Amino acid sequence: MNYEEAVAYIEETPKFTTKNKLEHTKECLRRLGSPEERFKVIHVAGTNGKGSTCAFLTSILREAGYSCGLFTSPHLVVINERFQINEKNIDDDTFLHAFEKVKKLADELVAEGSYHPTYFEFLFLMGMVIFADAGVDYVVLETGLGGKLDATTAVEHPLACVITSISFDHMQYLGNTITAIAGEKAGIIVPGVPVIYDGNDAEAAKVISERAQELGSPYYEVKREDAEILRNTMSGIDFSFKNEYYGNTIFSIPFIAKYQVMNSMLALKTIEVMKNHISVSEDAVCRGVRETRWQGRMETVLPGVIVDGAHNEDGVEKFVETAAHFQKEYPLTLLFSAVDDKDYTDMIRTILDKISFCHVIVTQVGGYRKLPAEHLAEIFKEQGCPSAEACENVEMAFKKALEQKGEDGMLFCVGSLYLVGEIKTAILKGTRK
């Protein structure tokens, strides 16, 4: 197979299907030569903020001189984004080489009358092969869904476990209470291995800390109040982490969203906890958080154009907190879309309750999960936004939103990572011409 055929093969594997047992994933790793044992792993779970926290960790480790692999999901434009080595996407040849190894194993399993790896499991196995072959020092490993039964939990000896913000999402798989969802996420905790977690939700924090105590794992809570924000502008945020280890250090992050302060503190606390295993100077830590780049989370993609992949109510509330900060200074335009298994009515209500937009355009994304643009527009109108316009084609909707934004306004594109991916693709195609 060539690269395009390999990608097509993976994409044809059902994404939402019955998971194989974790023992099956472990057996796959064993038959691949246990690649996950050839590097140190930081395992990251959570509802929101996983990818950003992973990016902060990776950037700090890189600035400290370590080689680092990063496995995340989903991808926005190309599937290679899921595998980064030293903060760069892998090339097509590297992708194909790992694909061939995992495909050979999958064929053997099927021939034996066993199981075929799921979509995510296939990619996870590829990631472990890619990073082992590259000889990286560390891998920052993001879970796909949940934690307890996630394929990534087949890695048995992480150096640290990190659990980011927990809220309602994927309830059909993880449960419909914070306690149940937190229990799934806490499934990544390993006996004796330190866990660093977002303690802002008391219910989730209780579940995580109790699980850590049961397993004899040291646990460290980080909360929003641990930060003192000193500056918040269109170029980023300066803050101090009220923490004895970092003292009076002032950190700068290149993001405008306050929630990224929390994600960066989780990474900073993780580095502190691992201080006996790694050598990282204060300068490297400061450079690491300052130079972190992450797609799709309050990301400025063009002047005055910000995309955010918030796709659940908690994520949208955090988006609103940031976007509302700018409505006194700029006329705001909104481009919105969502898929049918999200609480899109609550998301829309949350946005409109706090922000006044000069223009609102809705479009449709997500393949078989898409919601008709007209349906979303009607909900905006029901929620008090009678001027909402529907435009089915994302590229055309983006062009229209850019025109309505004008030279002096700001355009926020939010509601789905599918939307973010299609906008970034449109920009690459030269939509602005």
Language model feature labels by segment:
Residues 182-191:
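Membrane-proximal helix-turn-helix segments that form the acceptor-binding/catalytic region
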Residues 416:
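Active-site-proximal loop/hinge segments that shape catalytic or ion-binding/gating pockets
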Residues 71, 198-199, 213-233, 253-258, ...:
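Beta-strand->loop->alpha-helix junctions that form or flank phosphate-binding loops
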Residues 74, 123-173, 205-250:
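Extended acidic/charged loop-beta regions that coordinate divalent cations
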Residues 1-46, 53-66, 71, 107-114:
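Short functional linear segments
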Residues 201-211, 216, 304-306, 348-410:
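C-terminal helical cap/extension that packs against the catalytic core
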Residues 133, 138-143, 149-162, 166-170, ...:
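Nucleotide phosphate-binding/pyrophosphate-handling subdomain across enzymes
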Residues 29, 34-37, 63-156, 172:
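ATP-dependent carboxylate-amine ligase catalytic core
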